[in-house]
Amino acid sequence: RIGGNIQVEEGDYNFNNTITAMGYSPIDPSHRYALTYSGNFYYSSNNGHSWTMSSGFTGPGSHYFYGAKILPSKVELGKVIIAGSGYSNPPVFISSNHGGSFSSMSHGIPNTLVFDLASTESDNFIFAATAVGAFAFSTEGEVWEDIMGFEGPDQTYWTVEYVSEIYSARFGTYGRGIWDFIINDDPIISGDINQDTIVNIQDLILLVNFILG
C-alpha cells in the first residue's frame, strides 16, 4: 500500500491446488505461509518469491467454502499454528521452524472443524472457534478447554479475534450473535486465581465463571 493506493503483484508459483489459508509473520513479514485444500503446507522466507513444501506432512483439510486457518506467532519467529478439519486427523498442528515440521496441538479438543484461531498479544492463550463451540489453550497447561460455560450458546462458532484493548476474545456464532470472552480487566484477579502456584487454563476457567456469576 502506498498512500491511499493498494498495489497488487501476482506471484508465479504454482501450488497445484486451491489455497485455503494464508498468513505471514507479524515479526518479519518476509516469512509467508500457505495451506492448500489437500493439506499441503508451504513456507517462504523471501516475501513469496520462492516456496518450500513441508516434507512428509499432510495438514488438516478445510471447510468446503470457509477454508482453513494459519496463525503465526506474535512473539516467536518461526512458530506457526494451523487448523482445519479434524475428523480423520488432529484439527490443530504447531510448528516451531516455519513449517519445516509439525506436531499435533489437539489435546483436549474434540475431532471437529476448527474455523478460526486467535491469540493474546503474548501468545500465552490461543483461542479456537469450532463447529462444536469455543475453546482456549494455555501454553502453561498445554491443553484445550471448553470455555462456553453455561451462558455461551451451544452453536457453531465461526470466527474469533482477540481485542487487546478490552482483554477479550470475541467470537462470532451462527445465528446467535457475537460473544466476548473476557480474560482479565482487573489486576486484582489476575494470575493465580486458584492459588495452585501455576497460572494456567484452570485460572482462566475460574475467571469466566466469576464473570458469568
Give the residues covered by each predicted segment:
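Extracellular glycan-interacting surfaces
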Residues: 1-186
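Alpha-helical segments with a strong preference for the paired helices of cellulosomal dockerin domains
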Residues: 193-213
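Glycine-rich, flexible loop/turn motifs
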Residues: 105, 189, 208
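Surface-exposed or flexible loop/turn and strand-edge residues in extracellular/cell-surface modules
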Residues: 77, 188-190, 202
